[in-house]
Amino acid sequence: MVADPPKGDPKGYAAAEPTANGVSMLVPIEDVGSLKGGRCGSGDQVRRCLRANLLVLLTVVAVVAGVALGLGVSGAGGAFALGPARLEAFSFPGELLLRLLKMIILPLVVCSLIGGAASLDPSALGRLGAWALLFFLVTTLLASALGVGLALALQPGAAFAAINTSVGAPVEEAPSKEVLDSFLDLVRNIFPSNLVSAAFRSYTTSYKERLFNGTLVKVPTGGEVEGMNILGLVVFAIIFGVALRKLGPEGELLIRFFNSFNDATMVLVSWIMWYAPVGILFLVAGKIVEMENVGLLFASLGKYILCCLLGHAIHGLLTLPLIYFLFARKNPYRFLWGIMTPLATAFGTSSSSATLPLMMKCVEEKNGVARHISRFILPIGATVNMDGAALFQCVAAVFIAQLNHRSLDFVKIITILVTATASSVGAAGIPSGGVLTLAIILEAVNLPVHDISLILAVDWLVDRSCTVLNVEGDAFGAGLLQSYLDRTENCNSVPELIQVKSEMPLAALPVPGEEGNPLLKGCPGPAGDADTCEKESVM
């Protein structure tokens, strides 16, 4: 169905791509380029395209400039020449970006999940959750298998020379935790005992040595450590949203409150996005300057780094786009261009949770994912979908096995795959979370845990690549669910959202010839204008 052109002269109008509900809109020809994801022609259209993609370009340039600036400062003396005080001031703009993003994680995750869960009927909620978890499980298994295959093929640890203390970052003592205790900690964090403390603390098991019958015994002692328990908050928000829906009309006021709170948070996100290029530049540059000898580090661990980055590139540029193309029948690389800003932010911040606000905004405005999809799926994905971490952990496990001349039989390889897929959930979107859970995999296949100290030397780079792949998988999952709902709604024409009563009278429904996006009021175009249109949630 194509909307009617304006009365008068119909020349100079072309049909844009149909929206999710099958409506094509006639727009001026000069605007077609801006509607097709940034494909530009010449003249005014090029300038319009540059303005539309200015933030993306600035963010990508910031990453490149940060690498160049960091290498330049390192070549001029690095951290030793700057001194501690100047180095802290040099990295301060990046630290400020991290603080701004982390500031809005809590209200964004809680409000978006409560509103999303309350707005979906139970059957739709279960169906969406099941499809999302299936997608996350399959892609994580594929990433793990790819990591093991690349490590076995490239043999990154076969010709490795021992690293001395002058290489890379300071070597930290590798963490060690029993597999059972790690699983119990995961379950404990799913059900926090205090929601207030869960906003900034999580539960973990540590060990103390005690003398028992003349023998030193390692006794587990639990306690809380600094770090948001995002897994527990996600579970609580979903359950609370379902409970609000069960209340019926009595819970509608509270649902509207959480939706309004979430909209206000997204306004803050739109402001923070314009500071992101500056913060990313100094985050990347500051981390490179902190490294004592970048050249020696890459020479010693270059094959391991290459194996990890190559695996992330294959999974992110081939595997995930292929899955999206096969099931959604859309161009996956146009989808990737729409989330370029969150991907660059993920590289700079090295945190899936910190990238979540920008990812929500971009998938909704650039890639046409509905609000109730993105704000329900993306927080879950930031918690449980860790494709990059699973791939890196598999490469690291095989790398450490090769270092110690340990052979890996079929059973051990399967154990690595399954354990990496399961333990990646425990990373919970925190920086370097994958390294902390790598000890579980090494314990499962009886590999020495102390060799994790070698992985820590280059984790500053590999962890950033992991984060980019993690958030890309979350976005593709939301896009696939949007495509699935589009097909099922076209077949069944059953609305997924409940109607929330409002004191204000509802506007009349548009006639079929003027049908547009139902999430935007007063905008007849395919996606509306985010600057001039008033958003009205159907939740």
UniProtKB/Swiss-Prot annotation:
Na(+) 1 binds at G381, N385, N470, D474. Na(+) 2 binds at T383. Coiled coil: none annotated. The modification N-acetylmethionine is found at M1. The keyword Transmembrane applies. Glycans are attached at N164, N213. InterPro entries: DAACS, Na-dicarboxylate_symporter, Na-dicarboxylate_symporter_CS, Na:dicarbo_symporter_sf. GO terms for molecular function: antiporter activity; L-aspartate transmembrane transporter activity; L-glutamine transmembrane transporter activity; metal ion binding; neutral L-amino acid transmembrane transporter activity; symporter activity. It is found in: Cell membrane; Melanosome. Residues 1-52, 118-131, 248-256, 328-332, 364-372, 482-539 are cytoplasmic. Homotrimer. This is Neutral amino acid transporter B(0).
